[in-house]
């Protein structure tokens, strides 16, 4: 299993329910051959206007909104977010043919100003019985561990970091817990149904102290690479599962 790090790659918001509640299946849309960005609003209680290169693309965007995708030429672009108490601009480089997510979210520190991170979606081919998942930590909490089907497979993922995994298609139970703790989950457990040959981008956001923890998710269809056997997790004795890396988002706000 490979967990790395950001919602409508192309489609809808997926709201998290109470512990044990199913959150799927996720519906996939086709990937585009052109360069594009999708913009995700992940700041609870905020309403923002969004502009790309000075052109307004949305007004009054609320938490959970997934805007786009917006087709862009390769090269440098700027995305700005404005609203009551919010004035954030983020510059990014868009690669040819890339699908890039731009996420407005809160930092780990309570009361911190919103930040923006962006990253390219991993849209490479995948085996017919596999699903690819990207889980990003964009919540107002300390570093967290990720449990999949009751097993801790990623540890110490900080705000602005992510994990990427390829898993067998089907339903998986996912929970976010305080790093190194056996306490109750910060989020979940959630039953997430993943269709074969899809990429699901899942963002954990909000603050468990005020009950605003939730997720935003979107999916896209992937092409097959002919491989049949799903990737499995080779867990290590500490830290991440062997062969897995957790990286910060590609670009900062």
Predicted regions: what is each one?
Residues 1-10:
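Sec-dependent N-terminal signal peptides
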Residues 12-253:
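Intrinsically disordered, low-complexity polar regions and short flexible loop motifs
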